[in-house]
Amino acid sequence: MDKEIIIGTRGSKLALIYAQKVKDQLIKLANISDEQIKLKKIVTKGDQVQDKRLSEIGGKGLFSKNIEIELLEGNIDVAVHALKDMPANETENLSTYAYLKRNDPREVLITKNNKKISELNSNAIIGTSSYRREFQIKKIRNDLESKLIRGNVDTRIRKLDEGQYDAIMLSYAGLDALSFNSRISQTFSVSEILPSAGQGIIALQCRSDDQEIKTTLNKINDHHTKLRALTERNVLKVLDGDCETAVGVHSVIEEDKITLEAELFSLDGTQRFYEKKSSNILNCEKLGIEVGKILKEKSKDSYKKK
């Protein structure tokens, strides 16, 4: 490819690290020069409003919609997203086409005194921005309190250090990218806390009819990560939830077998519905649909507002 490629990204430190990673992969694997690739910072609504739950300011797509608009208007060629921030259903005329190799999807706890969750005082306040994490914490210790926290990673850590919270929950992948690993007090296994669907995956989106860009992106796509992403997100598509839907999803591929597990909480967090199934990787997308349907049936739509 000889033409210039413009990559659209959020302007946070973490998002720019992810975008630079994409650029580095294109240079290394797609034989594109450094001079050909430009990064364009785009402000999203999720970045602008930092004091409310995402569900209160518009729900799905708050971190991706403005970037997608730039893509549709032809101002950028590739959009870089954290997959977990994207709506389950694809935007018309766009294609989430390639995925970088998945980083560690696990959840971590950061505390001021390096305490584990079992060592926190009763009624300790844990900062989280998602109902999923809030309900999962209650599953481990129902005497802990959850309180909304928003902002980028360094802002959240600063709020913890200032004493606004006793602990905060974050994804390992983000902390690792920002070299904050030393702050981690506890890393939860996937069996302890199921992550968000697609957590730890950088997704690359382009216009559906841009065959030249698709050919280029295919050179940096990680096949197994793509299969896991499609499988996990099919669970979300079937559930058709929103930002308040508390659902954890994770998959693992071993040789030609993919194993998918998912949990769904009722709207108030008092009920938990769980399913785990395996299939041949050739049927991975069907597996996601099947698990989604089972959870939907088990829950009787108790995860949705009436």
Task: State where each predicted segment sits.
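Small-molecule-sensing regulatory modules
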Residues: 2-49, 56, 139-306
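Short, well-ordered beta-strand segments
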Residues: 6-8, 40, 79, 97, ...
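Short, structured active-site "lid" loops
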Residues: 51-77
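Short beta-strand and adjacent tight-turn residues that come in two discontinuous sequence segments
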Residues: 63, 81, 169-170
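Short, Asp-centered acidic motifs that coordinate Mg2+ and/or phosphate
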Residues: 76-80, 166-167
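A conserved helix-loop-strand patch within extracytoplasmic ligand-binding domains
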Residues: 83-84, 92-144
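Short glycine-rich anion-binding loops that position phosphate/pyrophosphate groups of nucleotides
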Residues: 83-86, 173-175
